[in-house]
Amino acid sequence: MEPKTKKQRSLYIPYAGPVLLEFPLLNKGSAFSMEERRNFNLLGLLPEVVETIEEQAERAWIQYQGFKTEIDKHIYLRNIQDTNETLFYRLVNNHLDEMMPVIYTPTVGAACERFSEIYRRSRGVFISYQNRHNMDDILQNVPNHNIKVIVVTDGERILGLGDQGIGGMGIPIGKLSLYTACGGISPAYTLPVVLDVGTNNQQLLNDPLYMGWRNPRITDDEYYEFVDEFIQAVKQRWPDVLLQFEDFAQKNAMPLLNRYRNEICSFNDDIQGTAAVTVGTLIAASRAAGGQLSEKKIVFLGAGSAGCGIAEMIIAQTQREGLSEEAARQKVFMVDRFGLLTDKMPNLLPFQTKLVQKRENLSDWDTDSDVLSLLDVVRNVKPDILIGVSGQTGLFTEEIIREMHKHCPRPIVMPLSNPTSRVEATPQDIIAWTEGNALVATGSPFNPVVWKDKIYPIAQCNNAFIFPGIGLGVIASGASRITDEMLMSASEMLAQYSPLVLNGEGLVLPELKDIQKVSRAIAFAVGKMAQQQGVAVKTSAEALQQAIDDNFWHAEYRDYRRTSI
């Protein structure tokens, strides 16, 4: 359901003059009316012409097109965001296809690597280990009192780029930009946070421009105590906030999620968001082929927290479709750098143990090796689906893809690693190696592939189709927790919007132009499931929809009235 348009109420503003122009959430620039210029001491501080936001956006678009590199475009957009947030979101929404890869992946990776070099203006909160005893004071310094969504990172596993120290702040900033652009969550309600626990990146430690704490990363009890101090301070300041963990290292991501998901409304997008969008994509792809996900055999390359999170959600979905847990697990094969995960493999991580295959069941496999490689697994399993979350480029070789295609006429291949420099195989190669028969979805954006005069659109398995809707649903319903069932409901709703399912052709995922509509639908599904699960107060469907409408922010200027502080 589309939101009903209604007249925005005036805002009462205590700021005036140059201070108002320096306030990104309130600044209108040349769009201040003459009455507002008189009332807020702005006469003479702006050019004579009063512009509309669309006129401002057109000028910004022309300026944007003058930049030749993606990183320069990113810097330009961030500058607009830090001076006039309403204009920033109007511009981004006008050109979402073009600008999403610039404000987030893949360009945000380069922005994180060069964070200290391209730093212009502070945004968000930097909490260093050195300041751990001032945690409450730091959060009290945040001027926005009604924070509803926090994205926090410690910068240790930024995309596929590894330890970027405080440069990882680029990820929470970018992620929250998508919460607003795609999910309609007001930027006034969002807060990016980086926990500066040091860095083990020697290049950063040696960089005279590096702005973070120059110290090796704290670990073990020191680390977990510091994170706990942060969580407790957040609960004290904003007890109802949604906290998203982002780009934490594998060794910390799952323990933190398991420890806090029932203590504060929280989730890990790398684990749960990636799983939800992947499962939604697979549900849609399976339905488009006239079947169910439970009928497919699936091989993973990459058995870290993200890969295992996807696998567990696939298993949950196939159980919903009628499989027993044992049968569901027998259809999922996890391969890491040491080969196929089996019950005979030493040093497994806790979250890997339920995803092993019994070695005794593999005795008839066609291989002489003790280490079962990806090629061995593909040759013997004959999978329908191949998913890459390895963070290593080129591991889906021609031999592997052709071997898969031998036994599967319409293979589903999903190289999900970010950024594009880490993708397991390019869509161009996958399409060519399968004679145009593969259905391909990637983690990073790729242009359509032209092969033998036919155009193949490439779906981006983008978490932005999931997490903004989850955030909006949590806020609108007042959910106190994010349950697995809420995530599954998001996946199911995403699959329902697949053009391939709806029309029998096109992308397996919706187009970006429809992302706000999809986010609103996911928000309703998530909110409804939260009520059914008892983590949100039950209301009528109409009341939930109204709450979604009321909380959906639009990039439009409001009239200002003067008031005192």
From Swiss-Prot:
SMART domains: malic, Malic_M. The keyword tRNA processing does not apply. A divalent metal cation binds at residues 246-247, 270. SUPFAM superfamilies: Aminoacid dehydrogenase-like, N-terminal domain, NAD(P)-binding Rossmann-fold domains. The active site is at 104 (proton donor), 175 (proton acceptor). InterPro entries: Aminoacid_DH-like_N_sf, Malic_enzyme_CS, Malic_N_dom, Malic_N_dom_sf, Malic_NAD-bd, Malic_OxRdtase, NAD(P)-bd_dom_sf, NAD_malic_enz_proteobac. Keywords: Metal-binding, NAD, Oxidoreductase. The record marks 270 as: Important for activity. It catalyses: (S)-malate + NAD(+) = pyruvate + CO2 + NADH; oxaloacetate + H(+) = pyruvate + CO2. GO terms for molecular function: malate dehydrogenase (decarboxylating) (NAD+) activity; metal ion binding; NAD binding; oxaloacetate decarboxylase activity. One of its GO terms (cellular component) is cytosol. GO terms for biological process: malate metabolic process. NAD(+) binds at residues 157, 270, 418. Its EC number is 1.1.1.38. Its cofactor is Mg(2+); Mn(2+). Divalent metal cations. Prefers magnesium or manganese. CDD domains: NAD_bind_1_malic_enz (cd05312). Homotetramer. HAMAP family: NAD_malic_enz (MF_01619). Belongs to the malic enzymes family. NCBIfam families: PRK13529.1 (NF010052). This is NAD-dependent malic enzyme. It comes from Escherichia coli O6:H1 (strain CFT073 / ATCC 700928 / UPEC). The gene is maeA.
